[in-house]
Design a protein with these regions (language model features):
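Catalytic cores of TIM-barrel enzymes
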Residues: 1-126
Length: 126
């Protein structure tokens, strides 16, 4: 079974030769290619290079476009702090939903609008 067959069979509940190996490798992939994490999470080409390299080198069954836990929140208007060599993080003292009623006023972000989610879609396209 190749990786694609393994993952699709597993998702469909069919037997597989072994469980798909699908670890979350964001920081590891970035370190493997010697990139700065800020570049990994903001430049889709760096993310793709890291994901392809780590999957090929270690025999993982997939690649992903995850970069940090703040990508979508950022596009919704959350205040996010970026770091040179670790994942971005939301600034908790300025939490977008510190007041839960703010949820009713949030606008849906446009994933193609040039924000951080757009970077993820560019990675998928590569």
């Amino acid at each position: 079974m190749n990786s694609r067959e393994r993952v699709l069979a597993h998702l469909a509940g069919r037997p597989v030769d072994c469980l798909p190996l699908m670890p979350i490798t964001m920081q590891f992939a970035c370190d493997l290619i010697g990139a700065k994490y800020r570049d990994y999470e903001t430049d889709h080409r760096v993310l793709v290079e890291g994901q392809l390299r780590v999957a090929e080198q270690f025999g993982f069954d997939y690649v992903n476009t995850m970069s940090d836990p703040a990508r979508e929140a950022s596009d919704c208007g959350a205040v996010v702090e970026h770091f040179e060599n670790s994942p971005a993080a939301m600034v908790e003292t300025e939490a977008l939903l510190g007041d839960k009623t703010a949820l009713t006023h949030l606008k849906l972000p446009d994933p193609l609008g040039g924000g951080r989610m757009h970077n993820s879609l560019r990675a998928i396209a590569l």
